[in-house]
Amino acid sequence: MESSPSSPQPTQSDPLAVFPQRTLEPADIAVLVLYFLFVLAVGLWSTVKTRRDTVKGYFLAGGDMVWWPVGASLFASNVGSGHFVGLAGSGAAAGLSVTAYEFNGIFSVLMLAWIFLPIYIAGQVTTMPEYLRKRFGGSRIPITLAVLYLFIYIFTKISVDMYAGAIFIQQSLHLNLYLAIVGLLAITALYTIAGGLAAVIYTDALQTLIMLIGALTLMGYSFAAVGGMEGLKEKYFLALASNRSGNSSCGLPREDAFHIFRDPLTSDLPWPGILFGMSIPSLWYWCTDQVIVQRTLAAKNLSHAKGGSLMAAYLKVLPLFIMVFPGMVSRVLFPDQVACADPEICQKVCSNPAGCSDIAYPKLVLELLPMGLRGLMMAVMVAALMSSLTSIFNSASTIFTMDLWNHLRPRASERELMIVGRVFVLLLVLVSILWIPVVQASQGGQLFIYIQSISSYLQPPVAVVFIMGCFWKRTNEKGAFSGLILGLLLGLVRLVLDFIYPQPRCDQPDERPAVVRDVHYLYFSMILSSVTLVTVSTVSWCTAPPTQEMVSRLTWFTRHDPIVLKEQVPSATPVPVTVSQNGTPEASSTNIQFEIVQENTSKTHSCDMTKKQSKVVKTILWLCGMESKGKEEPPSRADPVIVSLEEIPLVKTLLDINLIVCISCAIFLWGYFA
């Protein structure tokens, strides 16, 4: 068994034998403490700096973010601890084919800024369900989608990041899992609740820098340990566990490990599925997912949003080099643990009989890095976990507040929405903690593939509805709802079948039904997209077309339509979410006047009460962005909403040139590694 010369030889009887019983050195602890102080300082600075007492200020960071924090936040929101653990684990187990998801994301994030975002800006939307409410009318589709988004966030994103973070924290630090994660969640929730999206974006920018420094450092150590890329290509195919059964194919490296495009029938990621089946969930994630779109909507203008997307697209090249290749290096250096093939030994090594490839990245951190740098990489993993959780907390809070709560209480004041949004973050924290035992009990042998298979069952119908709504004016509510429900039902059936008939281990016969065994999840994504597309088109053709209000400024072809009424009306109050669905904005002005009068009276009462408020109450109100400022409030409710799609010609030209360069780089990478 190959191991670091400085580490003690682990014994197979110890369930944590894969990691030496190291304790953090003082330098490691100092780095971790400095990191947490940095994050809290940046979070509190952005909390003081930005306006948090309006819907736009809290949920969209005031709409004045410049390109670089937007780009950093896009990358940090996407690359969580699940990426570090999952991508490196998939690289160790099956080679670099999983990189296709990252390269696919390059095109999708650029499509967001150049194609989808102009439609969202023209339509003046805060959330994705709100766009569908304006585009199709009614409440069936937005409510269904809001619930689905929250389901996906809580039970896939939070659970996956929790699992990945748990692997790193528990296995490497030997800390109490609940204590560590509760502490992380407490810090994460504090600046999310206090600062809103601005705090999340600024801390994401800091954490992106830390992630890149730490991950690039580990990449250098990894390649040095195996003799560079040539050494990796030679040694990877020899990386076999010494205790592997000689007559078994289990645990063997794949012959196509260094290729992205693989056999269309027998491989783990068939190339037609990569080209077509993978693109639909990728479009959902980058172009219609609240977590991602919310960051670009917070940009100052369309040019800054494009700049941020370009920055994220360039950064998406890095996961292959800082995650996938190091995962493959980990298999070369530690084959007995990372490449274990015997279920009993895997159970002893990492408490997972399905395989231990997911320990590849933390194994590298603890074995290769010297004192101090080990603490830096601990901070990197914590940064990845926290940046993902803050993104999910803020975006889920936005959806719940603006789409579900606003539907239940259409006359809710701005103050009430601010309180509800922050309380919902606390509920998410509670759900996250309660979800930890479920994550611990789940099988994580193929963490990243698990994420993508779930995505392929639930996301294609939603993506098709958005695409049809944005690019076909004839699409109506009945067609979109029919396609969405049929697609989700089919996806849920396949999801349930996958849970009932889990994939057998390598040494077991595959007795699953043919629809589960023979239809790859990427092929199922293609089938699901086609069924949804045909349903939406057919029902829309056979029913009445949408009204002009539901099309104007809400599709690609109508985004430049003239503005019918004053555009400041929607931004003055959250009420237009319910008003616009009926296409009768004439009645909105009286509603807004009523709401402002109502809130002014409530604020007068609150001002009278400030003399009796304790310091604790004042602190809580400050955290919630509702400190008293006098009776002249609220002029802040009339924040301007960006509706202009105009760009400075020189800036637009530079961005378009960068777009061509970025796409060319992506095509080259596809071709080189295909």
UniProtKB/Swiss-Prot annotation:
Residues 1-27, 78-102, 162-180, 230-272, 330-374, 440-446, 501-518 are extracellular. Residues 49-56, 124-140, 202-208, 294-308, 398-418, 468-479, 540-653 are cytoplasmic. It is found in: Membrane; Apical cell membrane. It comes from the Eukaryota. GO terms for cellular component: apical plasma membrane; plasma membrane. One of its GO terms (biological process) is myo-inositol transport. It catalyses: myo-inositol(out) + 2 Na(+)(out) = myo-inositol(in) + 2 Na(+)(in); 1D-chiro-inositol(out) + 2 Na(+)(out) = 1D-chiro-inositol(in) + 2 Na(+)(in); D-glucose(out) + 2 Na(+)(out) = D-glucose(in) + 2 Na(+)(in); D-xylose(out) + 2 Na(+)(out) = D-xylose(in) + 2 Na(+)(in). Its main location: membrane. MI transport activity inhibited by D-chiro-inositol (DCI), phlorizin (Pz) and sodium (Na(+)). Insulin increases D-chiro-inositol uptake. Pfam families: SSF. InterPro entries: Na/Glc_symporter_sf, Na/solute_symporter. One of its GO terms (molecular function) is D-glucose:sodium symporter activity. Keywords: Apoptosis, Cell membrane, Ion transport, Membrane, Sodium, Sodium transport, Sugar transport, Symport, Transmembrane, Transmembrane helix, Transport. The chain crosses the membrane at residues 28-48, 57-77, 103-123, 141-161, 181-201, 209-229, 273-293, 309-329, 375-397, 419-439, 447-467, 480-500, 519-539, 654-674. It is a multi-pass membrane protein. Belongs to the sodium:solute symporter (SSF) (TC 2.A.21) family. Involved in the sodium-dependent cotransport of myo-inositol (MI) with a Na(+):MI stoichiometry of 2:1. Exclusively responsible for apical MI transport and absorption in intestine. Can also transport D-chiro-inositol (DCI) but not L-fucose. Exhibits stereospecific cotransport of both D-glucose and D-xylose. May induce apoptosis through the TNF-alpha, PDCD1 pathway. May play a role in the regulation of MI concentration in serum, involving reabsorption in at least the proximal tubule of the kidney. NCBIfam families: sss (TIGR00813). This is Sodium/myo-inositol cotransporter 2. It comes from Sus scrofa (Pig).
